[in-house]
Amino acid sequence: MVIRVGTASWTDRTLIRDTDWYPERSMSAEDRLKYYASQFDVVEVDATYYYPPSQELVGLWTERTPADFRMDVKAFSLLTHHPARRDAVWDEVLAQVPAEHADRGSIYLSHLPEAAVDLAFAKFAEALLPLHSAGKLGGVFLQFPRWFTNRRDNRRYLDSLAERLPGYDVAVEFRHASWFSGDSGPKTLRQLEAQGLAYVCVDEPQGFDSSVPPVLATTTDLAVIRFHGHNAETWEASGISPAERFRYLYSDEELARWAPQVTELAATASETHAIFNNCYQDYGVRNAAQLLDLLD
């Protein structure tokens, strides 16, 4: 049973600009990652959601981290039914966009023929090979939007993920209550288990259509918990930065309640990743360090 604790970024602007967590404000990208990896043994790569990485960049991450380090890589927005900036999409994929969508500034998965969707997944998977070959790739993490509801076509899309990312540990987070409303929860978990997809447990504000309850469950050998905090005022707010949306510092009491639950979940998996996504200033790294102390 392995429990890893880390944060959802090591390059958040407010962490670098507004805190003294890193030894120096002007550290190089290499030194910053090396320092992070000296404090935690897992990180979620958030930048890959906005722009798919090159294999060369992934190779640098691989070289700059210890042998036992893990990176959970967030899937490119296009692959999770979010809009993707046109300039972030691979040229080979853009070439297959039908004429009626060719001039759009944002590209959606629904604009693409099936062959282009397959190509996009293949390009993303290819870029991650250095991490995977080194045994440092944790999960390929797909965070779906709140409009990705529990309906037949979306369930079919989930069924396609393992085939499109062969050999990788694929983890799924939902942002709509329909996946767990009524008797849907057990069905959702059974589907993920049948397809070999890891369920991402969440701690987040409740009471919204985009809220998913804090169900702790494992559907593969990899268990994942993401801590989003409880800032209800900003959870669905528009026009704000991720740092503001997840601006929440967990209290000692909250983390003390979570520690035994993390341990209990970890007993059902080979490896568990607890990721703090409260990426405002040093909130995430502070809470991650606190949880590590509680788990020791």
Model-derived segments and spans:
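Residues lining hydrophobic/aromatic ligand-binding pockets adjacent to catalytic sites
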Residues: 1-296
